[in-house]
UniProtKB/Swiss-Prot annotation:
Transmembrane segments: none annotated. The record marks 68 as: Essential for function. In Drosophila ubiquitin is encoded by 3 different genes. RpL40 and RpS27A genes code for a single copy of ubiquitin fused to the ribosomal proteins eL40 and eS31, respectively. Ubi-p63E gene codes for a polyubiquitin precursor with 10 exact head to tail repeats. For the sake of clarity sequence features are annotated only for the first chain, and are not repeated for each of the following chains. SUPFAM superfamilies: Ubiquitin-like. There is a cross-link at residue 48 (Glycyl lysine isopeptide (Lys-Gly) (interchain with G-Cter in ubiquitin)). It comes from Drosophila melanogaster. This is Polyubiquitin. Keywords: Cytoplasm, Isopeptide bond, Nucleus, Repeat, Ubl conjugation. The record marks 54, 72 as: Interacts with activating enzyme. Residues 1-76, 77-152, 153-228, 229-304, 305-380, 381-456, 457-532, 533-608, 609-684, 685-760 form the Ubiquitin-like domain. There is a cross-link at residue 76 (Glycyl lysine isopeptide (Gly-Lys) (interchain with K-? in acceptor proteins)).
Amino acid sequence: MQIFVKTLTGKTITLEVEPSDTIENVKAKIQDKEGIPPDQQRLIFAGKQLEDGRTLSDYNIQKESTLHLVLRLRGGMQIFVKTLTGKTITLEVEPSDTIENVKAKIQDKEGIPPDQQRLIFAGKQLEDGRTLSDYNIQKESTLHLVLRLRGGMQIFVKTLTGKTITLEVEPSDTIENVKAKIQDKEGIPPDQQRLIFAGKQLEDGRTLSDYNIQKESTLHLVLRLRGGMQIFVKTLTGKTITLEVEPSDTIENVKAKIQDKEGIPPDQQRLIFAGKQLEDGRTLSDYNIQKESTLHLVLRLRGGMQIFVKTLTGKTITLEVEPSDTIENVKAKIQDKEGIPPDQQRLIFAGKQLEDGRTLSDYNIQKESTLHLVLRLRGGMQIFVKTLTGKTITLEVEPSDTIENVKAKIQDKEGIPPDQQRLIFAGKQLEDGRTLSDYNIQKESTLHLVLRLRGGMQIFVKTLTGKTITLEVEPSDTIENVKAKIQDKEGIPPDQQRLIFAGKQLEDGRTLSDYNIQKESTLHLVLRLRGGMQIFVKTLTGKTITLEVEPSDTIENVKAKIQDKEGIPPDQQRLIFAGKQLEDGRTLSDYNIQKESTLHLVLRLRGGMQIFVKTLTGKTITLEVEPSDTIENVKAKIQDKEGIPPDQQRLIFAGKQLEDGRTLSDYNIQKESTLHLVLRLRGGMQIFVKTLTGKTITLEVEPSDTIENVKAKIQDKEGIPPDQQRLIFAGKQLEDGRTLSDYNIQKESTLHLVLRLRGGIQA
């Protein structure tokens, strides 16, 4: 298709593009036509600056759309904006940018309207019409963002389908205003809305305060229908949308109505009825879809995404996120929505507690995933729940909690529906309506969880001897459950089993459905042979502890053994081996820790801090550290984030190269200090590969490497099979048999990785 690009001089350029072209590809085409380097181009559409890694279709840019080209004059710089939640945002700016421009950039990143932003620098509030240079704001300065809330409040509107909408309102809003807000969110015309509160229908001319509707009140929305018929559309998240349609409506019309209600572009929608995908040009009556039929909506996705957060009260919050958001960012968004401080939030996914510094994509959290939010309560008590697989779950409870509440908490942690749970204590099955104190269950008591199963599917497990075992399972079974079933059949203890599917080792806490294991899939069973061994753990005080372990023990198990010996809670322990911080879910053998190896134990003192690391490419990385962290620890964190081996890193602060064995506090490195990272290269060269999620991978290559070799290196790092990879450079797709030097790809060039998804759909 053709699009137009209009420059500030009034000149209009015509480009030939595809909807799947990235903004970067478009900039390369502009460079071909006009000679303007991509890093000096800023493209604007519908008032929004376009990001390199996103595609034209992500921004709904269609044929004959006009983009605006603004030039970034040399002397761009980065500044930081710190919010009250402690989150730090990085912005690309020019000294000549106005405060208004900066607020618009913050809106693009964080979604906060400019009129709710107050920016503070050097204790002074900044005025919209002034520039950064007026205030002497230079590169790497930190501004502080304070929100101006205006006496508004939130209310909820519940529809007959069970969907709950959240609205921002004022007590002085009329019912008419509220209906207009519902129309903005849901596309329902006001004249089809009836609002009910406390059993009373609300009149248009009256205000919320007339009806004593206060913050977090729930109104009920009933539709007044006329003609036509209703059908339901069910999404993968279980949400049901109600549509008003005619039998003669085409599938295309239906997708347009879904777009009006939910904002999902038609080209991202696939509709299924009676197991069949519906074609755009056909009508509802062609498919015999009648009133109150239910269609299923499956999304073809790319770019930003929605996730859900479910609280223990059953409330579900919807968040707009990117796969590259950290858990810390997510907690800040929850604080913005719900007012819960991040340090009281624990987020659980697939039965695992999520760590602040990791990203959503690290945990394979995808669009429309549901996280569970558990509050760390002051008071209360802890109890343990032991499953038949030997796994122990820790719950925060009150003595007055009912058994039903406890089962709900187990569901939040493990995803097991309450009606499949039986809880046993002191040999007795516990009844739903009774409380923990009725059964004299006290702090640190252990309950036993037995599952009642139903339904399910068969899978096969193939051993190295060629024997195939058949198992009855549920998609919601954890890998741990599967190992317990193998133990029942074959007598092999779970801790000696490693299960492999699609070339990947399966982790105990994840479920079969997490790995997309379906009926009649075949898993491969590899045995971990016994051999207990001793390792040593050395503390900063010089004390050495001896532990009895197995190579298959996880780092979590090791921390539990240290807690048994020394009383140090696992969440205050950081274990270091060979200069690398060890992750809870990995095993000793994953890190090649052998008998009589020595680990180093560093305590996480409350009161970590953030520092910044700036690379030669201008990229800034944010790290969570302690003043007591060694330079070695910091390099390990950089390796975790960027994949750069510690022995290739040189860190510079205040003009001095930092030595591995010294700590941050030795060098007086304080919160928000910026270190500089210089790479020591040996032979070869480095290139960068940028994914659509914005993640950048660093690869060591030779100019003579083929594109095929490069794809193999990406597979080693990211696990993406070569036949699903398309590599783009300077707007051109690279062919497997050609070399990097054929394409003039030099050191520190950036390639773009686009995935080819099974079934010919491109993401």
